[in-house]
Structure formats: C-alpha cells, structure tokens
Amino acid sequence: MKIVQRFLTAVLMMSAVTACAKIDPTSEPVREMGQFKLGHNVVVAENAQPGPLTRSTNAEELEKALTTAMDERLGQYDGDRLIHIGIAVDGYVLALPGVPLVLSPKSVLALTVNVWDNETQEKLNAEPRRFAVFERGAAETVVGSGLTQNKAAQLENLSRNAALKIQNWILENPEWIGLTAEDSSAEDAAQ
C-alpha cells in the first residue's frame, strides 16, 4: 500500500510541476517589435568555459545552436531599423545524467550580449548585458535534462530560452526599436 501511495504522490508532484511549467519559447505569440529588423547575428563561443559536471561540446555546436535560435525568434521581423546582435558564450553546463530527485543537475548558459544600431554604428547598450539562461521547466526536465534529453536537445532548449530572454531585453528598451514606453506597456498588457 505504501508503494502505491508513494507512486501516486510522485505522479501528483510531477503533474503539479508540469502544470506550473514555463511556456515553450517557440509557442509564444509573435510580439510587436516596432522597427526592428535583425542585422548581423554574431555568436562567438571560442572562450566558453565548461562548468562542473557537464557534457562536452565545442564552440561550433554552441554557435550554431544560438545562431539558429536567434534567427528563428528574431529573423521574422521586417522593420526599417537594422539591429545587430553580438553574443559571447562565457560558459555552459549541459547536464549529465544524475540520480533522479537526489542529484539532477540543470543545464545553463552564461552569455554576454551587445546590441548595435546599423544606421548610427553605435552600441545601444552602455554596458554589455550578462545573462544566465536556464533550461525551461517542463515535464522532461523535472528529473534533470541529463536523464531525458540528449546534448542536442539540451542545446536547442537553452538557445531558444536565450533568444527569448534577449528579445525581452530589447523590448525593455523600446526606444532602440522605435517603440514608445506606452507601446511596450500596451503589448505587455495584451499578453
């Protein structure tokens, strides 16, 4: 009887966590980006430092995953203001398989991002913006993505989350893309 009780408790906990999971970045509605048009999408991962307990990867795989995710999320906008985005991958952890519910490491990317305006040839952000990007909460990552996902899936998940974070950061600075604070607030209220 206790085994059944434990099993049901585990199922309920998994269901609760799944219900509270974050939205998949690829299923979010298209957001108003004003005059934004993605120019150069530059990702550099040559100096990326692996964290503890990580699967191995290389600069090429990191760069490809992030470039693809940025194109997927921001390449669809066709405004009049060409914006260049430069991303440096500072570090990463691609979770190894662990022991469920005891040691279930999470994946993370550490990024430094800069944004430039093509017309003025000036950097829009005064200081480089640093991001720590974690895997999204979902049923398949509850016990650690190292157990349920291969390296490619982990990289794709992290890269899509990074692209969403960068988009949200740009939207926090509406003047960069020809939006007013009111436009940005109205967009947030509509969602």
Where are the language model's segments positioned?
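Bacterial N-terminal signal peptides that target proteins for export
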Residues: M1-L8
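C-terminal motif of bacterial Sec signal peptides marking the signal peptidase cleavage site
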Residues: S15-A19
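A structural "domain/chain start" motif
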Residues: C20-K64, E175-Q191
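C-terminal/domain-edge helix-coil "capping" segments
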Residues: A21, V142-Q191
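Short secondary-structure boundary motifs at beta->alpha junctions and helix caps
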Residues: A48-S56, N125-K165
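N-terminal, post-signal-peptide region of Sec/Tat-exported proteins
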Residues: S56-L82
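Sec/Tat-exported extracytoplasmic proteins
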Residues: M70-D78, V93, A162, I166-P174
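Surface-exposed short loop/turn segments
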Residues: D78-N125, R136-T148
